[in-house]
């Protein structure tokens, strides 16, 4: 199975399955001398981990990360960093009924078509459980970006179902279980989630992630454009079906005179481009959005087939998120951090001596 690695100079390779013994990853490219402890990684893992509220799956995994290598006396050595999280709350018996049945909307059918077999326990490698290691690796990148370059990455929920959420207060995001920046909408989200649980159904969501303090010049035209790599990283997250950079699809309704981000000696007058022009960061805030589909793991009966081609009715058992967008917020932050750190290292490697007299804001 290929496709388990992201990045060129900052490289993250993950391994493990939902109901296997453990999840792990190898992080290459971390510069030496960076202070790093397991506690530095645990905060974001706790934000992502299951069982933290009544609105998410009740699978209770502590997600305690272990640093196996690459750190000595509290600082990175410049060698590969090995990370491990043990699985402790698997209930594989919940999935015995789907051993020969393809859950509609899941990767069961496509994995079996590709490999001729599949790990049906919680989806195996296709499960979003794998993203725990992305968050751990992303926490390393976030720490490096913040401490060495002053880059701060934040994410939040900006829509659930037909409830749009305004980014009114970033401080509110960590104060509620929805990662919601709009305190006026929390009651509506709670009501929607209660209704979904009662119905046994699920709902989609939109997540926004931003990066402040990114310098101008990151991105490698033409095939490794910064926006292309961000979209690639975000699209690799489970359940993501669309990614927008800046105004995204809204630019269709704009005229060129409206959409262009005009420049004065004080700086840019707008940021429709989301901080990226020609695939290269402009020094403005980087803005990305991703759309997540409603999970197909629901108790509403649905039609499917088994591996023998027979039609059957499917009701998904197990412990699942009514809205996967909630726990996707720290995952989106991690993926953006991984991409930005990779491009920072690439920029330093090729263009460290480049100086310009052009203003930077």
UniProtKB/Swiss-Prot annotation:
Annotated binding of FMN, by residue: 125-127, 238-239, 278, 293-297, 319
GO cellular component: cytosol
Pfam entry (one): Chorismate_synt
EC primary class: lyase
GO molecular function: chorismate synthase activity; FMN binding
Catalytic activity: 5-O-(1-carboxyvinyl)-3-phosphoshikimate = chorismate + phosphate
Family to which this protein belongs: Belongs to the chorismate synthase family.
Entry-linked PANTHER family: CHORISMATE SYNTHASE (PTHR21085:SF0)
Record protein name field: Chorismate synthase
InterPro entries assigned: Chorismate_synth, Chorismate_synth_AroC_sf, Chorismate_synthase_CS
Residues holding NADP(+): 48, 54
SUPFAM superfamilies per the UniProt record, alphabetical: Chorismate synthase, AroC (SSF103263)
Organism: Citrobacter koseri (strain ATCC BAA-895 / CDC 4225-83 / SGSC4696)
EC number(s) given by UniProt: 4.2.3.5
Subunit structure: Homotetramer.
Cofactor note: Reduced FMN (FMNH(2)).
Functional summary from the UniProt entry: This reaction introduces a second double bond into the aromatic ring system.
Listed cofactors: FMNH2
CDD domains reported for this sequence: Chorismate_synthase
GO biological process, one term: aromatic amino acid family biosynthetic process
Pathway it works in: Metabolic intermediate biosynthesis; chorismate biosynthesis; chorismate from D-erythrose 4-phosphate and phosphoenolpyruvate: step 7/7
